[in-house]
Amino acid sequence: MSDPAYDNQAPQEQPQQQAPEGQAVPVYEQPEAETPQAPVASESVAAQPALSEQEALYEAPELETPAQAASDNEWQDEDVSNFRPVPRVAIQAFCESESVANTIDYASRDRRMAKAHLKVQLGGVNAAVEFYQTATTPNLILVESRLIGEELMTELAKLADVCDEGTNVVVIGFKNDVALYRDLISRGVAEYLVAPISMGDIMGVITTLFVDPDSAPLGNTIAFIGSKGGVGSSTIAHNVAWAISSNYESDVVLADLDLAFGTANIDFDRDPAQGVAEAVFSSDRIDETFLDRLLEKCTDHLSLLAAPSTLDREYDFDADDFTQLLDVAQKGTPNVIVDLPHIWTGWVRKTLASADKVVITATPDLASLRNTKNLIDTLAELRPNDGKPYLVLNQCDVPKRPEISIEEFTQPLDMQPSIIIPFDPALFGLASNNGQMISETDSKSEIAATFDTFAQILTDRREIEAPSKKTMGSILSKLSRKKSK
């Protein structure tokens, strides 16, 4: 069963102006042996036989002829002119034919895809399975396959085994079969496209998945709060944001909501002219475009919404003042890290209640235990249908300081800490003074590995494992006696 366009063979009787049929080939193919132009995509790909399928990143050629440029404009006007910009999502495509690879790469060049990170690689489902054995999966995987029936389902089952939660899979095949389509959708495939495909097909499926106003928000909001001042909640939030963005190449917006005393700009060695203050004081103007102007780019995948950290005005807010800001951020970014100050106001309470996940940072002392217990109980009332917050025990094993043991600390909370971070003033002090994260200062340290583990936990890339427990003298009875007074 052969399809000339799908096999990357240009139909002899069809001129290039028929490209609106959705065929990528006429845009990229060159007449054989007519002009000494630079090698096209098929030649550049063939010149890389030493690379394995998952390593062979596809590089499409630039437009070189007026005919190609005209065809490009034709596609853009007909297929994608009405599409909205795609948010900050990671997309990888595994293609068996150059025609499909060309089309997807062409779509990635469109201005509406400027925020997305799209990579095209040669190889089909098998290449994707092999690649993701040792790599995390993006927001969307596009796979091309000539298989049908049980053979296709078997290959997709292997792919499902290596996919992280929340990853969408779109299959590009060659058989126009309603039964096949229904079978794929019933097995969790987001969409099935029949080749030959157009740039409009690719843009359409991406915008349906991530831009559709009726679809679920793209990102998860993770709110960090300390059980008391000075426990290191901001430091934890900043390092986790760094770990998610660098380890998984997943876009992160870090919002420092401690407008008066926030430290995110210092920790990342940035001095943005605007940030969260402009957003919250102009909440009626907040949209994706306005938010983009306020973000300070720290890395390719990490953007900072910094606090002004000045005392030239009072920062009194209503309960709903941050709602619009966080809603807009969540619609356009896979991960929104919210660094909350240690205060208890209407807007902090509402932010915690509406967050997808909450992280409480505490130190092993009585005040932290009491406040952590109060926070957990309050969150249970505010979020009755959500899981418990994540607990981070920080600054443990301070020399000569009596501490509550991990076992005694967690017993009244009825939960285990997700991670335990030891007291290391030299490492944290050096990182802070240099405007770096822990993994930048000492990537081989156990603490850097701990932040990597927590990033995996918060992004649902592994099961939560309880850290080892330590035993020390019990002083929990002191807290009980104080409560009884």
Roles of regions detected by a PLM:
Residues 124-132, 137-160:
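Conserved phosphotransfer microenvironments
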Residues 197-205:
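C-terminal output helix
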Residues 220-266:
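Walker A/P-loop phosphate-binding motif and the immediately C-terminal alpha-helix
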Residues 276, 434-449:
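C-terminal boundary of histidine-terminating zinc-finger modules
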Residues 328, 345-365:
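Inter-motif core of Ras-like GTPase G domains
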